[in-house]
Amino acid sequence: MYFITCLENLEHDILGWMDPPRCFGYFPTYERAAEALKTNECDVWEMGVFEYAVIERIESGIHPHSKEMSWWKFDHEKRAFSETPKPEEIVNEECYALG
């Protein structure tokens, strides 16, 4: 499944923690998950709360690893998310959807 998770920002505190991400849902295909972000479906941006999103392909299991990840940033002109390269602030982090 392809999980959509949004993040307020990418800043880490002194202990290395980020603000808690929010998983909005999942879809059976990447294309459908990407379409949800491209159209800001159900306002996953939440009127300005979330600046970043990640789509992760996660298989079933206990503590599964992300098999694929794509990063997105909110485009204020388009009022929707646009795909972006993996941010430099993200190092060896994964599985935002399930913790």
Model-derived regions: residue spans:
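Short, mixed-charge low-complexity intrinsically disordered segments
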Residues: 39-99
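Compositionally biased, low-structure terminal segments
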Residues: 4, 25-31, 51, 75, ...
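Terminal low-complexity, poorly structured segments
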Residues: 3-6, 33, 94
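Short aromatic-glycine-(Arg/Gly/Cys) micro-motifs in beta-strand/loop hairpins
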Residues: 1-23, 49-54
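A short, charged, amphipathic alpha-helix used as a generic interaction element across diverse proteins
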Residues: 15-21, 27-50
